[in-house]
A protein has these predicted regions:
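Generic structural motif
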Residues: 66, 114-116, 277
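Helix-turn-helix DNA-binding helix
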Residues: 73-76
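Active-site-proximal, Lys/Arg-enriched surface segment
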Residues: 79-158
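"Short basic amphipathic alpha-helical interaction patches in structured regions
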Residues: 60-62, 127-134, 170-171
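Short, charged amphipathic recognition helices of the HTH superfamily
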Residues: 51-65
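Single, function-defining residue in the core of a domain
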Residues: 1-54, 69-70, 80, 91, ...
């Protein structure tokens, strides 16, 4: 579908009357369509907000949409607090049905690559948020417990080839990765049923229950292996063997530990599990800054292992490693975009309902922006050498004319062509082996960065001869 049609469908979803039952906590809410902030205004406001304060967001958003006086800050906060965040899941469901399923999709050897991962979003330091979402605990220093800021766990399922967020959850920080993964897969079951799928996940998602579930549904998977998985079978593998198949019997006692009934019943009928084990070896040099300010190169060796059920005839050892380390990394990049460019941790209240709405709305915006970026990437004349500058695309999608056109559903063909050309014009060079440096970044002063670095806000600093450098310990 053309970009204009995709955006018009997306806008019609935001304005759909089907959303009203899902948006109401109080039955009498959002009944007036002639007020300053009916439901469609509130949803668009939350999706496109970008300021550093509530006042800035209101002043940016309302003059572009109507000639009436903007609502007060108290009115906006009140509307946010009575908006049921289930409405964002309904919007996502309609997006999948009306946009994702009909769209032409990129695949790898006929497979969709669906990555699942989670991150933490730092919340305002308020006792209610600490109770609702939890706080980080310090096992090494119990005296710090209760003093860390609250944080919510954000989990998404992401189509890495098509750059589409398929499902999202915002939950308590202590919720484990595996239950969230199953929740994603259950939500997407009808969406993925007609496709060949490869599930990509890191080491915290692996389980016999997941592997047998994928076997039931016909899904393929690539999961980073933990060292304590299938010890007996792995010990029998010849040390120099880098690609083999493990045959694992799930015995009766093991079956009793399976949580989901339908998977347990399936395992009781088919107790043998065939898991492909792939081994990879990496060597690289890393440069560190010593306390004297000198640079020291340290040579690292790393052995990594992966579980999969893909056939070796279809995907060889190098293919598996490439998919995991290259393609799966897009979900990490997506989280970086949400935290640094979309500013998902910029929150205007300590109300847990409002905070959940603010976070989920920016995830919806990410899908709108990805539609524009994908169209611009198709116009990229040198795709192997350059990428469209995502920051520039986000700025254009937040511009006044785009917000006004999206809200009114009057999307000019000429203006959209200009938008795509401008997005494709500003590009960044692809430099192999280059990555964002997290540790040993030099600083001449101590400052408090707003965003996290590798999951840490305000990472530890070590004192060096000429200033400071970030540290991972």
């Amino acid at each position: 579908m053309k970009l204009r049609k995709l955006l018009k469908i997306f806008s019609s979803i935001i304005h759909s009357r089907e959303l009203f039952p899902y948006a109401r906590i109080i039955p009498s809410s959002f009944t007036r369509e002639d007020g300053k902030m009916p439901l469609r205004y509130l949803l668009n406001y939350l999706i496109f907000r970008q300021g550093m304060s509530l006042s800035e967001d209101i002043c940016r958003f309302y003059p572009d949409l109507n000639n009436i006086n903007p609502p007060s800050k108290q009115a906006v906060l009140k509307r946010m607090s009575i908006l049921n965040y289930d409405v964002w899941h309904k919007i996502q469901q309609m997006f999948l049905e009306r946009i994702y399923l009909p769209m032409k999709k990129k695949t790898m050897k006929g497979y969709l690559l669906i990555a699942v991962d989670g991150t933490f979003a730092t919340l305002p330091n308020h006792p209610v948020l600490g109770s609702i979402f939890g706080r980080k605990t310090h096992s090494n220093d119990p005296e710090k417990n209760g003093h860390s800021p609250p944080q919510a766990k954000v989990s998404i399922a992401y189509d890495v080839l098509n750059k589409v967020i398929l499902d999202f959850q915002v939950v308590h920080q202590d919720i484990s990765e595996i239950p969230l993964l199953f929740k994603h897969l259950e939500v997407l079951e009808n969406v993925l049923k007609d496709y060949k799928v490869i599930i990509l996940a890191d080491r915290y998602y692996g389980s016999a229950e997941l592997f047998k579930y994928c076997e039931m549904k016909g899904y393929k998977y690539i999961v980073r292996a933990k060292s304590n998985f299938f010890k007996k079978e792995r010990a029998a593998v010849i040390p120099k063997c880098v690609d083999t198949v493990l045959h694992i019997l799930i015995h009766k006692m093991w079956q009793k530990r399976i949580i989901r009934d339908h998977i347990r019943r399936y395992i009781s009928i088919y107790p043998i599990m065939h898991v492909r084990l792939i081994k990879g070896h990496y060597e690289y040099d890393e440069e560190h800054i010593t306390t004297s300010g000198n640079r020291k190169t340290i040579h690292h060796q790393l052995d990594a292992e992966y579980f999969s059920n893909l056939s070796s005839d279809e995907f060889d050892t190098e293919d598996i490693i490439h998919i995991y380390h290259t393609e799966r990394w897009d979900i990490e990049t997506n989280y970086g975009t949400m935290k640094t460019l979309l500013d998902i941790e910029q929150l205007n209240t300590a109300n847990p309902i409002s905070i959940t709405n603010e976070i989920m709305a920016k995830i919806i915006f990410a899908n709108i922006e990805n539609l524009v970026r994908n169209t611009a990437e198709d116009k990229n004349c040198r795709p192997g050498e350059h990428l469209v500058n995502n920051k520039h695309v986000i700025e254009l999608c937040r511009s006044s004319w785009f917000v006004r056109s999206f809200f009114s559903r009057r999307l000019s063909v000429e203006k959209l062509k200009e938008l795509v050309v401008e997005c494709a014009r500003v590009r960044v060079m692809i430099r192999e082996g280059r990555h964002y440096k997290r540790w040993d970044k030099f600083r001449n002063t101590v400052h408090q960065p707003h965003h996290r670095i590798d999951g840490r806000k305000n990472p530890p600093l070590k004192i060096i001869k000429t200033g400071f450098a970030t540290s991972n310990h």
